[in-house]
Amino acid sequence: MSTLPGTLHSAHNGTWQVAEHGCQVLAWQADDKPVIWFDAEHADESEAVIRGGIPLCAPWFGHGPNNDQDPQHGLARRTDFEVTVADPFRVVGVAETASIGIRHEVVMTNTALKMMLTLTNHDQKPRVVEGMWHTYLRVADAAQARVRGVRGASWHNFATGDKGSFDANELAVAPDTDTVIQGVGPALALLDSAWGRQIHVETTGCPSAVVWNPRSSSTHADNPTAQAWRDFVCVETGACKDNAVIVAPHSDLTMSTRISVETL
């Protein structure tokens, strides 16, 4: 029987929540509506992986830039972090995976969720690293959702194989959306029109983004995540694939993401 999500640090009656496992954000909201999607009834996605929330994908994303790394999406989300908690609600987790030190800082306030990731190369040779927040953003209806702020960036939809660059500034969340975006700007917004709001995702040091939703045009939803496709859109930010970073020995890669909500 799964013990995930394990030890939790909570505030505001559980509407703000971080798990020690993966130093993974599970909940945050600024008003009466949740901003993060987390399936507490089916918390174990697979062995040692929490379903939903904001999984931390590091020191590689997917199977790495050369498609030769396992497990998928790195070791961070499968690792129990050493965590300290401060007030106001601030969680700092540290871990060591594959000679890469990981420090993840989470700060929650009434107006924003802020995260900062630092990856340190403890190896004696340069390392290619990736880091992404695989953020599950809660929406009223993903079929009506759009992501704004993509104009000029390049894209590759790994569900369809299509690729190109954005002329328009918005991406609709259609079936078969698994779109890696490179050269994206520092300000994205998820338009959650059914709930009359937009969720801002502002970043530093994050040239990559991924927009993903499990709705498929051809296959049946056969797991709890796919069955809940209408309830979330993943807007993932960080550095991955073509923007993987070579980190010198004893050097760092640092990036940050800030999430906030505004009425449409």
What are the functions of these language-model segments?
Residues 1-51, 186-206, 249-264:
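Beta-strand-rich N-terminal accessory domains
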Residues 17, 82, 90-92, 103-105, ...:
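Beta-strand secondary-structure signal
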Residues 45-46, 103-106, 242-247:
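Beta-strand-rich interaction surfaces with strong enrichment in secreted/lumenal proteins
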Residues 46-49, 57, 192-234:
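Glycine-rich active-site loops that engage anionic ligands at enzyme catalytic sites
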Residues 69-110:
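Extended, loop-rich substrate-binding clefts of extracytoplasmic carbohydrate-active enzymes
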Residues 95-135, 139:
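Acidic, contiguous internal or C-terminal segments within carbohydrate-active enzymes
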Residues 126-128, 136-209:
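Active-site/ligand-binding surface loops and adjacent short beta/alpha elements
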Residues 215-264:
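C-terminal appended segment following the main domain
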